[in-house]
């Protein structure tokens, strides 16, 4: 059925192409043919209910947006060898001496993006009535779940900066907003790669709004309306625009 096919795509494959999908469909056909040959059944109908009988337990968990707006949690978008994925960034604050903890198997470039985001938020702290001594009196822990999976690249810069500002101010971020873009020390948003794959991941996760770099706006012409769908795409040049779109 159509539902079973969608479940195969979302729960049993994770790739940029269709090779793995072809293998999974082949496995279903072989097991169905064996049942018919052995005389157990005359016709096989594969549905969402009996799919596990053919492919076993799902290998992947479909990505879905959070159910409620939360403080210090923002959904980013990443481009991997198997296509686009959503990337949840979590920030927690603890009394301390201003140290920064980064976990989630992050690469050097991503760690540098986190430091850039922190520096930018510190530079605008007066605009948000943040105590100048706040960052000297608190430790910042930035975590990207699925810690066994390596993550790198600069495109989560605006996501981490948004999560940090949310945690520091206590203001929640919309659960239906995703974003991608590199950040500079001045808060400018720089272009990224893999926009098509990232937007597809956002659509599959149920996101309603996606912030992308203004310099990537021209790439939208090459992306089908089927992928963009009903999502609101907001091209941004500066973090001010990201914050306006993301905060509740």
Protein language model regions, located:
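Short conserved motifs of the RecA-like P-loop NTPase core
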Residues: 1-13
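C-terminal helical "lid" of AAA+/P-loop NTPase domains
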Residues: 9-10, 19-38
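Amphipathic alpha-helical
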Residues: 36, 40-63
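Peripheral, non-AAA+ core regions of ATP-driven protein-machinery
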Residues: 43, 61-65, 70-75, 83-248
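C-terminal accessory/connector segments of nucleic-acid motor ATPases
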Residues: 48-52, 76, 89
């Amino acid at each position: 059925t159509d539902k079973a096919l969608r479940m195969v795509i979302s729960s049993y494959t994770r790739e940029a192409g269709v090779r793995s999908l072809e293998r999974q469909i082949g496995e279903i056909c072989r097991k169905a043919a064996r049942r018919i040959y052995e005389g157990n059944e005359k016709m096989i109908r594969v549905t969402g209910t009996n799919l596990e009988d053919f492919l076993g337990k799902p290998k992947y968990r479909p990505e879905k947006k959070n159910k409620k707006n939360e403080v210090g949690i923002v959904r980013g978008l990443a481009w991997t060898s198997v296509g686009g994925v959503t990337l949840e960034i979590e920030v927690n604050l603890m009394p301390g001496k201003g140290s920064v903890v980064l976990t989630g198997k992050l690469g050097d470039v991503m760690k540098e993006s986190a430091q850039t985001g922190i520096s930018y938020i510190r530079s605008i702290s007066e605009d948000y009535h943040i105590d100048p001594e706040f960052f000297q009196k608190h430790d910042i822990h930035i975590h990207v779940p699925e810690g066994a999976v390596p993550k790198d690249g600069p495109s989560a810069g605006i996501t981490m900066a948004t999560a940090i500002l949310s945690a520091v101010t206590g203001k929640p971020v919309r659960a239906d907003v995703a974003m991608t873009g590199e950040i500079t020390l001045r808060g400018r948003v720089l272009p990224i790669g893999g926009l098509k794959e990232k937007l597809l991941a956002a659509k599959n996760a149920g996101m309603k709004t996606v912030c992308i770099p203004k310099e990537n706006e021209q790439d939208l012409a090459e992306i089908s309306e089927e992928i963009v769908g009903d999502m609101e795409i907001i091209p941004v040049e500066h973090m001010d625009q990201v914050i306006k779109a993301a905060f509740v």
